[in-house]
């Protein structure tokens, strides 16, 4: 036989902790998906804002955008 059965008495049960009991309700929704798009449009909006922010940083770094009164010397 290729498989070996492990004795059931050797398995230990997970230890219950106070923080685990406190966080269990947060994990009770695991695997459940709300119908519809949910907050996907909001996430897309913030992704666009983040992309704009990163492009502004890149343009400032490349001196494509000149900031008056701020000397940039790398």
Curated annotation (Swiss-Prot):
UniProt-listed SUPFAM superfamilies: Photosystem II 10 kDa phosphoprotein PsbH
Gene Ontology BP terms: photosynthesis; protein stabilization
Locations listed in the record: Plastid, Chloroplast thylakoid membrane
Gene Ontology CC terms, in alphabetical order: chloroplast thylakoid membrane; photosystem II
Superkingdom, taxonomy of origin: Eukaryota
Family affiliation: Belongs to the PsbH family.
Subunit structure: PSII is composed of 1 copy each of membrane proteins PsbA, PsbB, PsbC, PsbD, PsbE, PsbF, PsbH, PsbI, PsbJ, PsbK, PsbL, PsbM, PsbT, PsbX, PsbY, PsbZ, Psb30/Ycf12, at least 3 peripheral proteins of the oxygen-evolving complex and a large number of cofactors. It forms dimeric complexes.
Functional description taken from the UniProt entry: One of the components of the core complex of photosystem II (PSII), required for its stability and/or assembly. PSII is a light-driven water:plastoquinone oxidoreductase that uses light energy to abstract electrons from H(2)O, generating O(2) and a proton gradient subsequently used for ATP formation. It consists of a core antenna complex that captures photons, and an electron transfer chain that converts photonic excitation into a charge separation.
Entry protein name: Photosystem II reaction center protein H
Organism of this sequence: Welwitschia mirabilis
């Amino acid at each position: 036989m290729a498989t070996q059965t492990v004795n059931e008495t050797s398995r230990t049960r997970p230890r219950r902790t106070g923080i685990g009991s406190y966080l269990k309700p947060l994990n009770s929704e695991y695997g459940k998906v709300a119908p519809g798009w949910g907050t996907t449009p909001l996430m897309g909006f913030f992704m666009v804002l983040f992309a704009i922010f990163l492009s502004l940083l890149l343009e400032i770094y490349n001196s494509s955008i000149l900031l008056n009164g701020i000397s940039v010397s790398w």
